[in-house]
């Protein structure tokens, strides 16, 4: 079991925040230079026309710092096999034999990267051509979501041997066997679309996502899933930086 003290976890969130803030302005300038801006349908509300040209693909601001920090942690885990690496990790309160990363953190990272690429494709498709202002057609976007969810659910069930669910007010978990796959798919696709539905007002999606990841981080802490705790608060830090640029009036 990993031993990740809360101060280290909060440090990760802080580092993620500053990395995203520093990376954000060059990203916005680059998107403007490449004219990757929001395209609004002419038949939409007049109030939405003010968003015309606002840089899109803002998920990159969140994804890049989280990905970089996770890779660095993975490398640090590799260093733990050496004396110097163990001394470095011990400085942050990690005991010998502990790990900074594991399957529990690689799975959500893979989901984040997968949905991030799908979102980027959706944004790029909506820039010009017959799908300008629309993006990927709903059936193609949904098919992509289902595919990512299927791969993830199969990995959770067969690679991590997850087959049971816990319900509130019930002490024992319910073993649902292979039904774990469709249940996990439903939850993943549902949560993804829930974020899409809140992505209308400046700062709304980022703030609700930050609260959700913070809550999941606390749950991970209570369950002793420290790598997942670190991942959640790393994401919270990046989301708070995203809000720095996404709050009204949004630059991204």
Predicted regions and their residues:
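"…together with the soluble PPM/PP2C metallo-phosphatase catalytic core" -> "…together
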Residues: 1-252
């Amino acid at each position: 079991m990993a031993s990740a003290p809360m101060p280290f976890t909060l440090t990760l969130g802080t580092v993620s925040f500053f990395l995203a803030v520093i990376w954000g302005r060059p990203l916005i300038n680059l998107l403007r230079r490449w004219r990757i801006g929001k395209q609004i349908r002419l038949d939409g509300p007049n109030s939405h026309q003010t968003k015309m040209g606002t840089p899109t693909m803002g998920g990159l601001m969140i994804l890049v710092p989280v990905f970089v920090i996770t890779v660095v942690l993975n490398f640090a885990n590799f260093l733990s096999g050496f004396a110097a690496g163990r001394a470095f990790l011990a400085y942050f309160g990690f005991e010998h034999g502990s790990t900074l990363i594991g399957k529990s953190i690689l799975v959500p990272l893979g989901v984040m990267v997968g949905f991030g690429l799908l979102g980027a494709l959706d944004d790029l498709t909506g820039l010009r051509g017959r799908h300008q202002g629309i993006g990927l057609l709903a059936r193609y976007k949904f098919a992509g979501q289902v595919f990512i969810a299927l791969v993830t659910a199969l990995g959770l069930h067969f690679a991590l041997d997850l087959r049971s669910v816990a319900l509130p007010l019930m002490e024992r978990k319910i073993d649902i066997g292979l039904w774990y796959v469709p249940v996990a798919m439903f939850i993943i696709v549902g949560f993804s679309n829930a974020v899409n539905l809140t992505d209308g007002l400046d700062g709304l999606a980022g703030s609700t996502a930050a609260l959700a990841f913070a809550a999941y981080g606390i749950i991970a802490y209570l369950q002793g899933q420290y790598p997942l705790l670190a991942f959640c608060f790393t994401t919270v830090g990046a989301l708070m930086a995203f809000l720095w640029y996404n709050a009204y009036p949004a630059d991204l």
